[in-house]
Amino acid sequence: MKITDLKMVPTKVGYRHQLIIKIETDEGIYGLGESGLSFRELAVMGALRHYRELLIGKDPFKIGAIWQDLYRSQYFEGGRVLAAAISAIDIALYDIKGKALGVPVYELLGGKHRDYVPLFATIGRPVGQAMIDGAHELLAAGWTAIRTGMHAPHEVNDAGEGVFEPWESVGETARWLNRLREAVGDRAMIGIDYHHRLSVAEAASFCQKLGRDTLDFLEEPIRDETPEAYEALRRMTHVPFAIGEEFASKWQFLPYIERGITRSEEHTSELQSRFGISY
């Protein structure tokens, strides 16, 4: 079996701009993959055009070798755009191999370990009473882990107007999160995604405004470029961090794990769409 083509399909899922790829073979079996770098899908498409020439004629079963070829094929390897492109290819190749062998992908990775994977649901409502109402709806539907977003006063709109006000945000968000915990009790794990909008001081202030048992995880409170910043924040709060959505390589995780900074690596599906399965 040989790879004959790589096709790209930019699409929109809800408000997100996503990129789906299709790798075709000379035996009629094809694989689908996804790039996880939403809103930068055009940049990923540019990288995939480079990689397409390297893929044509390759054996799609040699997934690990292809990953290494793509990653090492140019002097300036790595980075979020290239990692997203490689991950889409990697996922599609596993799809091809699973179809050709007639097995699900997990059989290629050592077999099934469990019958289901725990997930969380995002409330998707503005911070306030609507957030609490949304949480009750999710609990009634059977969810036991929920995530919400932050209060975003004066958020930048589509016209580029407005300025995010962090101090107003942390105060209002913390107040309503404490109320949310009171409302749902211990029936659910609660997390919040701050989309790395805060400084260390702002994130510390936010955590200090929370009750001891309010949050089960705080996702991406600050930028990830310097582990030292997260290390400083780690000393200021007991709240577990969920980190890694911005990472573009497995090596970026190392200092966070070694220093005990993170207790939860970011969503597995997102990591696969950024790094691939072989990674």
What are these language model-derived features?
Residues 3, 28, 51, 89, ...:
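Conserved, mostly hydrophobic/aromatic
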Residues 21, 26-27, 32, 62, ...:
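Ligand-binding pocket scaffold of soluble enzyme catalytic domains
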Residues 267-279:
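Single conserved hydrophobic/aromatic residue that forms the stacking wall/gate
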Residues 1-32, 36:
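Structured beta-strand/loop patches that form or line metal/cofactor-binding pockets in enzymes
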Residues 116-236:
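Metal-dependent enolase-superfamily TIM-barrel catalytic cores that perform enediolate-based chemistry
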Residues 200-207, 248-260:
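Catalytic cores of alpha/beta
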Residues 1-14, 98-99, 103-116:
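N-terminal amphipathic alpha-helix/helix-capping segment at the start of soluble metabolic enzymes
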Residues 26-101:
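Metal- or metallocofactor-binding catalytic centers and their adjacent structured scaffolds
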